[in-house]
Amino acid sequence: MIPRHSLPFDVGTLFSVLIRSSSARLQSDVEKAYADALGVHKSLLLPSVRAGIHMAILAVSKSDTIVAGPAYTCGTVHVAMALSGAPTRLIDSGPGAFLMPSDGIYAATEPGCALVLSEVYGLSYDQELLRNACGKGPGLRILDMAMGIPDPGRTRKLEATDIALFSFGWGKPMYAGWGGIACFQDSELADRVRDIRDQWTVPETFGLRFRHGNSALIQTAMNHRSLYGLSHEPHLYRVLRKTASPSHEQGCQLKISGSLPPQWTSPMTPLNRQLALYNLRHSAQDAGLRRSQAEIYSGLLVESGAVRGPGSKELPQSHFPILLPSAVRDKMCDYLRGRGIDTGTLFPFPAGLSRDLYPRAAKTAGEVITLPLGPSITLDEVRMVSHRVKDGLQALGC
């Protein structure tokens, strides 16, 4: 079965890195390697992107700071925004789009606010439109690039009030077993975020290294096609998911007896850091492959009029999202799975939000299917998946 997520390395690479992890570079060395490669003044390793979003907001917050961000994004982004305690303004998606529209951003922001820009599926905001949308001068722009691959051409253009965040977590193109990284052009802002990170981060123990290594090994092995279908049988999947997880986060209940879940406090281990360096060295190659695959999906499915989704000028990186009527969305997922293709339905619409206030985000959440991109699928298989989608549309009477 073709997995829904594609990892940047296989088990053999992981074992090779695992052998070298005992002599892994220090955290500061990895941060410098990323900063140098991406053309930024500083970078910081983080427990997760969600932690980075919240730390960034705390670093600039004043008593009157508001936080604006997308209604359509990962639920952990909403949690990170809300945890600051600042008033939050959510922005609906653009018509027929996955990202926020420039007029919506302009209307929701004000001077000195914190603005979260989630680039879902690795779809990027047009920089010129974004510059016009941010004409009121947000005090902080958090570029949530968790689902993307770092591009030096973009990161070099970050401004002093920008923070770019990339995820090393599960299902992301830069997966390294755990963690994330923040990129800054302003050293003072980076230092404020580092102070918060250092206050929150727990010590790196042998037990933590073992859990992170065990998690990465199981997740990588079970993502191999020969095991993937078996590992996703319902009963076994629950067991493996619990075993592979280095922590057990309790949803959005972030503060329990004054503590935070591991996704907010656990540092990256030597293995995670070595994998992050491996990903950095291969990022341009992986980005090129995913771009070629996305172009095929776009041409065969979107530009042909078979489905709605990203056009050739706005290519995603983590997965290729398509939109189908909500009445047949889940049936299409079942149809493809029956033909050896696993898909996803990220992101569900948050239960606490009003569908009337954010109708486009709610509609997208009920219609989206994510198709696989990355090293786990060949170009010919991308064409095959596209044809299977078309076959499914015909079989389902669409």
Walk through the language-model features, giving the residues of each.
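Conserved SAM-binding loop
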Residues: 45, 69, 182
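A glycine-/small-polar-enriched, mobile loop at the entrance of the PLP active site in fold-type I
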Residues: 2-31
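Active-site phosphate-binding strand-loop segment of PLP-dependent enzymes
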Residues: 96-192, 199, 374
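Residue-level detector of anion-binding/catalytic polar loops
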Residues: 87, 140, 341-342
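PLP-dependent aminotransferase class I/II
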Residues: 4, 29-44, 49, 116-117, ...
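Conserved PLP-anchoring active-site segment centered on the Schiff-base-forming lysine
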Residues: 56-108, 336
